[in-house]
Amino acid sequence: MTQQPLRGVTSLHFNQDQSCFCCAMETGVRIYNVEPLMEKGHLDHEQVGSVGLVEMLHRSNLLALVGGGSSPKFSEISVLIWDDAREGKDSKDKLVLEFTFTKPVLAVRMRHDKIVIVLRNRIYVYSFPDNPRKLFEFDTRDNPKGLCDLCPSLEKQLLVFPGHKCGSLQLVSKEKLVELRRGTDPATLYCINFSHDSSFLCASSDKGTVHIFALKDTRLNRRSALARVGKVGPMIGQYVDSQWSLASFTVPAESACICAFGRNTSKNVNSVIAICVDGTFHKYVFTPDGNCNREAFDVYLDICDDDDF
């Protein structure tokens, strides 16, 4: 998720198992552990300049970097793979791969076998990390936020991105599976994430609201009351066929945020983490019946560690 700089934050993103999150900043990069919340490391401005996007491969030494902000060292049309384990004092010694395009890169998603690179109207998928080759590419609706997520499970080839209806999501493997809707009023989607076992999906909007959907048991999701009515027209029928979130919450500051799933506190209680561009950290718990409450709050930008990444 990218955002106009607030306290120096240009974008935020969780790693694949959602145990860490990356913070791209005017001053470089910060990496945080989620539970417990602490800074794991950082790259300073001298090393990487101001950064527009950063993606971390699990908890490894590999980062995907895209330049941005007011004083970038790297281009906004290139994805650079940074290997922090490589020896060398110069930043060029750490760069091991480069993917270059003709238009700005808006998002990058990685897992152990693939890298997904998102432009405004197109998505590219490559094998990764050894000898990358393009697997496929496809057009999307206008996607100025670069919203996209790749299921971290190697057994499931799932990709999710904005649907053609405003406020909807397209969930695909080789073909469309289901359409999910966050609400009736238009809103900009900022982040989408799968749960660890792909049973749930969460999505956040520019209104600071996070919606949680059930994927494994879709009967938990709410549906339009019109679904109980008989035959309806084609436009209403498309609306009726959609599924609505089983639970939702809004962060108090109503600030744009990214969201992901935290550790489960019990069999029937799940948790969602919301990280906001204003520097705040929120943890909510929810149950299958839709109850949702905040459990923890902190300010991650006030947490500093002098260790490099």
From Swiss-Prot:
InterPro entries: PROPPIN (IPR048720), WD40/YVTN_repeat-like_dom_sf (IPR015943), WD40_repeat_dom_sf (IPR036322), WD40_rpt (IPR001680). It comes from the Eukaryota. WD repeats lie at residues 4-42, 184-223. The keyword Ribosomal protein does not apply. A motif (L/FRRG motif) lies at residues 180-183. One of its GO terms (molecular function) is protein-macromolecule adaptor activity. One of its GO terms (cellular component) is phagophore assembly site membrane. It is found in: Preautophagosomal structure; Cytoplasm. Gene3D superfamilies: YVTN repeat-like/Quinoprotein amine dehydrogenase. GO terms for biological process: autophagosome assembly; autophagy; autophagy of mitochondrion; cellular response to starvation; glycophagy; nucleophagy; pexophagy; positive regulation of autophagosome assembly. Keywords: Autophagy, Cytoplasm, Lipid-binding, Repeat, WD repeat. Pfam families: WD40. SUPFAM superfamilies: WD40 repeat-like (SSF50978). The keyword Mitochondrion does not apply. Component of the autophagy machinery that controls the major intracellular degradation process by which cytoplasmic materials are packaged into autophagosomes and delivered to lysosomes for degradation. Binds phosphatidylinositol 3-phosphate (PtdIns3P). Activated by the STK11/AMPK signaling pathway upon starvation, WDR45 is involved in autophagosome assembly downstream of WIPI2, regulating the size of forming autophagosomes. Interacts with WIPI1. Interacts with WIPI2. Interacts with ATG2A and ATG2B. Interacts with ULK1. May interact with the PRKAA1, PRKAA2, PRKAB1 and PRKAG1 subunits of the AMPK kinase. May interact with NUDC. Belongs to the WD repeat PROPPIN family. The L/FRRG motif is required for recruitment to PtdIns3P. This is WD repeat domain phosphoinositide-interacting protein 4. It comes from Rattus norvegicus (Rat).
